[in-house]
């Protein structure tokens, strides 16, 4: 949870949590690819994966330049929507990765997402300018991961979902870093 603390600390904590989750998602994606997806299929699927991400339907910024045009509150809202869209499906990850070294902590991914959700909500409360009143967070979600790893369709579905998970967490990490840099102007700001 996020106790009362300075805004700079709230941002620092949220960025660290987002970085950790993005790294975990990237490692999991790579491990899944290495374990289940034949080399010749890896590149042919990349194009179809990007089209199937739910997050593509959200009018969220897609790049750094686009994100720089948005207010901090808008970026926090987009981040919250992205995080919340994964809360349900991520609970099925541990069943998919029963023997995984990377996802040995998969049961904790849900808790880590909830922590990040709380951190983003704490930032939203701190920055609240009245625009949150009446703001209804939609709770659309991704499909659940398929635990049948003997089925090629299920493998490709999970591969696509992991790709989306990685991309979405990268977006959240980027948005949070951008806001932190904008607010606190650190000289070593790299996004």
Swiss-Prot record:
GO terms for cellular component: extracellular space. Disulfide bonds join 53-164, 181-189. GO terms for biological process: animal organ development; growth hormone receptor signaling pathway; positive regulation of growth; positive regulation of receptor signaling pathway via JAK-STAT; response to nutrient levels. It comes from Chelonia mydas. It comes from the Eukaryota. Its main location: secreted. Keywords: Disulfide bond, Hormone, Metal-binding, Secreted, Zinc. It is found in: Secreted. Zn(2+) binds at residues 20, 173. The lineage of its organism: Eukaryota, Metazoa, Chordata, Craniata, Vertebrata. This is Somatotropin. Belongs to the somatotropin/prolactin family. InterPro entries: 4_helix_cytokine-like_core (IPR009079), Somatotropin (IPR034975), Somatotropin/Prolactin (IPR001400), Somatotropin_CS (IPR018116). The keyword Disulfide bond applies. Growth hormone plays an important role in growth control and is involved in the regulation of several anabolic processes. Implicated as an osmoregulatory substance important for seawater adaptation. One of its GO terms (molecular function) is hormone activity. Pfam families: Hormone_1 (PF00103).
């Amino acid at each position: 949870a996020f106790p009362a603390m300075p805004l700079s600390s709230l941002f620092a904590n949220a960025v660290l949590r987002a970085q950790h989750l993005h790294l975990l998602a990237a490692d999991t994606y790579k491990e899944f690819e290495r374990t289940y997806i034949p080399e010749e299929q890896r590149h042919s699927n990349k194009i179809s994966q990007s089209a199937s991400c739910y997050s593509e339907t959200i009018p969220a910024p897609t790049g750094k330049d686009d994100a720089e045009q948005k207010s901090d509150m808008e970026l926090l809202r987009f981040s919250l929507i992205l995080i919340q869209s994964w809360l349900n499906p991520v609970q099925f990850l541990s069943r998919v990765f029963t023997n995984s070294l990377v996802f040995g902590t998969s049961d904790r991914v849900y808790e880590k997402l909830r922590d990040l959700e709380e951190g983003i909500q704490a930032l939203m409360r701190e920055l609240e300018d009245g625009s949150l009143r009446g703001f209804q967070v939609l709770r659309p979600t991704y499909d659940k991961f398929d635990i049948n790893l003997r089925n090629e369709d299920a493998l490709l579905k999970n591969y696509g979902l992991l790709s989306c998970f990685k991309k979405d967490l990268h977006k959240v990490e980027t948005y949070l870093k951008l806001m932190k840099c904008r607010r606190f102007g650190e000289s070593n700001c790299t996004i």
